[in-house]
Amino acid sequence: MRHTGIAAPFLQPDLESELIAPVGVELEDLHAVHVDLGDVRLDAHRHDGSWTGQHAFPGFRYRPDGTEDPDFILNQEPYRDASILIAGPNFGQGSQQAFAVIRLRQCGMRVVMAPSFGPVFYDDCFDFGLLPVTLDEQVVGRLTERVSASPAIEVTADLARQVIERPGMTPIPFQIDSRRRLSLLQGLDVTLTERLQHGADADAMRKRDRSLRPWIYDTPDP
């Protein structure tokens, strides 16, 4: 996994997952969810046909009258097209972690960088193909300064090499647990990645998982 894109700084500390994913729009409301980690695509619609990704960060994105708040970073150019989020410490704490990860993917995010994450949110990122990168708070600050000064210059997150790169900056190393790194590189969730390495029932397990979560797999069931 190597991703290059616009990075948007949104450094509010202790941002709860409920503020990312509104409680009123749950997975049960989705008409269809398609996740393709090969193409890195996640599409989801509500029954009314609207994109659920539009509901990410609703309390920040919209004013009380429903119009966009121009002060919110993702409502500004070029950050509307951001696929990398630079976040504050303890990002994604709370009880809506899985929904928060899905909303971030639906609004185009591929990578989130922060000094720390809510632990359950962090785990859920690997199940939905979102790369969570933990960086020192000072490093996050320096990266934010560079991005804010030249927002159109893209940032690259290279999972295979475990490095963040941006023109004019020294590459920034990061660490991902080897099993989680493998899960993202292979496009599987962590538990399944481990199990598929062992045991004679690996094929049966994969077939069962394919029937439960067909969107994870790039090819149709033989």
Predicted region positions:
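Cytosolic catalytic domains that perform sulfur/thiol-centered chemistry
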Residues: M1-P222
